[in-house]
Amino acid sequence: MDKTRRLARGALLTALALGLSYMERFIPLQLLVPLPGIKLGLANVVTLFALYFLGSRTALQILWVRCLLGSLFGGGITAFFFSITGGLLALAVMVLARRLPFLSIYGVSVCGAAAHHVGQILVTVVLLRSGYVFAYLPFLLLVAIGTGFLTGAISAACFRAMIAADLPFTSNMEATYVGKIH
């Protein structure tokens, strides 16, 4: 793929991830799960897409730009540290989890959601200088199972649709990962 096409695809995916992240602010998830800081992680659908179809390097680039721009547009420096730490840890775990033959996209997504929460707890511990925050982690990990599964289900549905549409960048995906998507 040439540089211009790769850059355009990365910019489009970053914009999509930013849009999903912004849209997620309007979903009243606290009505269902009354815990502070809980989000669905819809932008992770884009990260999963990039990881599976375009590679970990592209996924990392999209993650960096999304976290940076998202913080500039509506979060500030503290939000950046929460977002980038959770995102980097989630991506690293998903890169490793994807290699496990028994994990589908659902499992990879749940692992990423759990890692994201761990990353955010680590930032909170540093900011508050208190280990008591770790008491909140079990609740976040339980939520990660649900949100990670939902994000994985959305990703799997999107992936199946893209493979069925026979998009050019999905040909390798079908041969390699189609069994692990379902």
Predicted regions and their residues:
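Positively charged n-region of N-terminal signal peptides that target proteins for export
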Residues: 1-5, 57, 99
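Alpha-helical transmembrane segments of multipass membrane proteins
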Residues: 17-21, 47, 90, 94, ...
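Membrane-embedded alpha-helical hairpins and interfacial helices in multi-pass inner-membrane proteins
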Residues: 34-36, 76-81, 99-182
